[in-house]
Amino acid sequence: MTVPTYDKFIEPVLRYLATKPEGAAARDVHEAAADALGLDDSQRAKVITSGQLVYKNRAGWAHDRLKRAGLSQSLSRGKWCLTPAGFDWVASHPQPMTEQETNHLAFAFVNVKLKSRPDAVDLDPKADSPDHEELAKSSPDDRLDQALKELRDAVADEVLENLLQVSPSRFEVIVLDVLHRLGYGGHRDDLQRVGGTGDGGIDGVISLDKLGLEKVYVQAKRWQNTVGRPELQAFYGALAGQKAKRGVFITTSGFTSQARDFAQSVEGMVLVDGERLVHLMIENEVGVSSRLLKVPKLDMDYFE
């Protein structure tokens, strides 16, 4: 027997989490949903091309939809919990979900962007969600493009969520890894983390040449609020103290308009917000891996 589609996992995941006010480990939610759906051993053994178990993958996508609907959240790595809105929804819907309710949760919030913590930045504030009937009428190529977009969006949300949970020192290392993948520094050792007490607002230094004559200074912050002009002025002062010509300020949050105006008014300062950082990590496969899917296409020249 085949494993039920991910939309069928939405209600079991939702109902199980409603019994766990302190949250539950994702692996426990996977098993509870599989039990609720009556999956046998053969169904639980099925895997997707990446090697992940199908039922765990579909339970994960069900939880993704609940998060986008504002009904659930990830408290930490591998721990899920309903939001107050989620508990309210379950309390007001004691009867089994109708097909219409399931479809609404499965498809209406596909492109809603997650904001995993108050200090996170919205990755893409506005986008239209495709109707499930519209998707059903789409060509396979269109559905493939939409699926790829959903996967990228989901990974982007997960990357940002994990960035917000790592230690400040680990975040600084990650930022330097990203900059190295972008081509800064001939060798990874050319990018040095210097953050710590008395760092003067400098978290990393990149040597652009072997003698270290040309350097880029980096500030990497998991900011709890939008970064304003005062923070950039302090960073600019730290750059001046190093007689530096170039500086990069990277944050998981965003920048105020005043901060951006200040950065444009001085030479050599580049700003990277959470959205840009996440997409740089995805594009350069820092903390992210990818798999190749071969899509067949007829070679007309061969038959001529």
From Swiss-Prot:
One of its GO terms (biological process) is response to hydrostatic pressure. Residues 120-142 are annotated as: Disordered. GO terms for molecular function: DNA binding; restriction endodeoxyribonuclease activity; type IV site-specific deoxyribonuclease activity. GO terms for cellular component: bacterial nucleoid. InterPro entries: Mrr-like_N_dom, Restrct_endonuc-II-like, Restrct_endonuc_IV_Mrr, tRNA_endonuc-like_dom_sf, Type_IV_Methyl-Rstrct_Enzyme. The keyword Thylakoid does not apply. Pfam families: Mrr_cat, Mrr_N. Keywords: Restriction system. The keyword Signal does not apply. Coiled coil: none annotated. Involved in the acceptance of foreign DNA which is modified. Restricts both adenine- and cytosine-methylated DNA. This is Type IV methyl-directed restriction enzyme EcoKMrr. It comes from Escherichia coli (strain K12).
